[in-house]
């Protein structure tokens, strides 16, 4: 898949770009879990990840040891997020916020996992600052040491300028967030520039919305918050809506509000 891959084991593996889209996830998974010693990235080889794409699997070194991403997630939801660098101000506030809010993610059956291109040793030292700032005993989730940029490449966690430097060791990841459901489908993608910190309340809000819409077959309007009214999809007839939801408020034939259960 890459223009050059320096690994004896990979030379024994068939590497061809799939001609059919449904084969892509299988190829990505093989790439992600194979041992890679060095490589030359090409932008044309990069996986195209979209909402409802299979989340690529991978093996990685983390602050809790080696993990397989799918095994770590199990049958939970997942939030994979990257930060540009350890011991930097915005990243410190972000990871501290995720650590402090871990109980809220636990309530929603969501597992967190962070990432940057520093090694695990750097992460472990930085975690001491995180614990102090967040006032927590433990961060509560692993942070990947993506020193070879494998996961950053898989999940396109770089900006246009950074991609030019992906092979020279100077790349830093942007602030990416991937929400992944128990079927290992990517359900939501956020990408923030390095200068702008994320909003953890928004991450929780969209998880609430995704889980609610999956469960009840509704959709959520702009600025929706838990306990707000939801929208009945246009594909549901009025008779079906009455049977399923009871009372609803019809603004237009295509815009009908109801209470969530």
Swiss-Prot record:
GO annotation (BP), single: cellular response to oxidative stress
GO molecular function, one term: thioredoxin peroxidase activity
Listed Pfam families: 1-cysPrx_C, AhpC-TSA
Enzyme class: oxidoreductase
EC number from the UniProt entry: 1.11.1.25, 1.11.1.27
UniProt domain Thioredoxin: residue ranges: 49-212
InterPro entries: AhpC/TSA, Peroxiredoxin, Peroxiredoxin_AhpC-typ, Peroxiredoxin_C, PRX_1cys, Thioredoxin-like_sf, Thioredoxin_domain
Gene Ontology cellular component annotations, sorted alphabetically: cytosol; mitochondrion
Phosphoserine PTM sites in chain numbering: 53
Main subcellular localisation: mitochondrion
Catalysed reaction, written as an equation: a hydroperoxide + 2 glutathione = an alcohol + glutathione disulfide + H2O; [glutaredoxin]-dithiol + a hydroperoxide = [glutaredoxin]-disulfide + an alcohol + H2O
Coiled coil regions, renumbered to chain: none
Oxidoreductase found in the keyword field: yes
Subcellular location: Mitochondrion
Active site (UniProt): 91
pH dependence, record text: Optimum pH is 7.0. Optimum pH is 8.5 (using glutaredoxin as electron donor).
Subunit-level organization: Homodimer; disulfide-linked.
UniProt function note: Thiol-specific peroxidase that catalyzes the reduction of hydrogen peroxide and organic hydroperoxides to water and alcohols, respectively. Plays a role in cell protection against oxidative stress by detoxifying peroxides and as sensor of hydrogen peroxide-mediated signaling events. Involved in mitochondrial protection of cadmium-induced oxidative stress.
UniProt similarity note: Belongs to the peroxiredoxin family. Prx6 subfamily.
Note: The active site is a conserved redox-active cysteine residue, the peroxidatic cysteine (C(P)), which makes the nucleophilic attack on the peroxide substrate. The peroxide oxidizes the C(P)-SH to cysteine sulfenic acid (C(P)-SOH), which then reacts with another cysteine residue, the resolving cysteine (C(R)), to form a disulfide bridge. The disulfide is subsequently reduced by an appropriate electron donor to complete the catalytic cycle. In this 1-Cys peroxiredoxin, no C(R) is present and C(P) instead forms a disulfide with a cysteine from another protein or with a small thiol molecule. Present with 4510 molecules/cell in log phase SD medium.
Name of the protein: Peroxiredoxin PRX1, mitochondrial
Organism: Saccharomyces cerevisiae (strain ATCC 204508 / S288c) (Baker's yeast)
């Amino acid at each position: 898949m890459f223009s050059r891959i320096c690994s004896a084991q990979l030379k024994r593996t068939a590497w061809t770009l799939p001609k059919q889209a449904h084969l892509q996830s299988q190829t990505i998974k093989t790439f992600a879990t194979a041992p890679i010693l060095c490589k030359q990235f090409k932008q044309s080889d990069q996986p195209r990840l979209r909402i409802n794409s299979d989340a690529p699997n991978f093996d990685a070194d983390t602050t809790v040891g080696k993990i397989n991403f799918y095994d770590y997630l199990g049958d939970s939801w997942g939030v994979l997020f990257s930060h540009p660098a350890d011991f930097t101000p915005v990243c410190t506030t972000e990871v501290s916020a995720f650590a402090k809010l871990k109980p809220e993610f636990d309530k929603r059956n969501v597992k967190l996992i962070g990432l940057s291109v520093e090694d695990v040793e750097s992460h472990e030292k930085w975690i001491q600052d995180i614990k102090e700032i967040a006032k927590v005993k433990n961060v509560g989730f692993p942070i990947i040491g993506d020193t070879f940029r494998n996961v950053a490449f898989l999940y396109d966690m770089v900006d246009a300028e950074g991609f030019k430097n992906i092979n020279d060791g100077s790349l830093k990841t942007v602030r990416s967030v991937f929400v992944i459901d128990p079927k290992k489908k990517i359900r939501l993608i956020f990408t923030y520039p390095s200068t702008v910190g994320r909003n953890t309340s928004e991450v929780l809000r969209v998880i609430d919305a995704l889980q609610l819409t999956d469960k009840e077959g509704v959709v959520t309007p702009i600025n929706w918050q838990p306990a707000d009214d939801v929208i009945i999809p246009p594909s549901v007839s009025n008779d079906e809506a009455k049977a399923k939801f009871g009372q609803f408020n019809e603004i237009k034939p295509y815009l009908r509000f109801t209470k969530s259960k």
